[in-house]
Amino acid sequence: NIQDISFDEENPVFVTDKNRHTFDKVVIACGAFSKKLTDKLDEKIPLDTERGYHVHFKDCDHLLSRPVIFSNRGSGITPMEQGLRVVGTVEFGGLDNPLSKSRIKNLIDNAKYMLGDLPDHEDEWLGFRPTLPDFLPVMGPSKNHKNVFYCFGHHHLGWTLGPISGKIVSGMIAKENTNLNLDPYSSARFN
């Protein structure tokens, strides 16, 4: 795990719990955990953590044949190998706050309202989604350190947008012409 970032002249140094690693250039792409490193670089990027919840009901996948969204209750249910996954609540809650039992209860209540009697749920989960106030990711060089690049803040679309964002940032590092105006994604927009 990366504990700190420092510099050997202009070269970034990642300090882990076991060693120090010096690089010519680095990309901070740690999702919701990126803020812990950007704060150490004196960049005030207002990254927050959007926490999305779900619960699983085991051996209930036979109740539905396809995903269903109940917009009037703000919930969705998807049959999966593990059973039924119930989703539909999100909050800004940071990385350290405990899971909200009231949000879990809301998901369970919605599932039972929609499908009737269900067995006890199998597990509870929440995921950390890196979110910025303008809903745009941060991509590009640090405003303070030319050998540090950023690629984070994709909200719940990280799995979708991560690969193309990674390609764009790697092109920037290689000084390739991207033919894109990347100013809206700069970390400087917050300073």
Could you describe each region identified by the protein language model?
Residues D4-F7, N11, R20-H21, K25-K146:
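Active-site substrate-recognition segment that forms the wall
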Residues K143-N191:
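C-terminal lid/capping helical subdomain adjacent to the catalytic/cofactor pocket in oxidative enzymes
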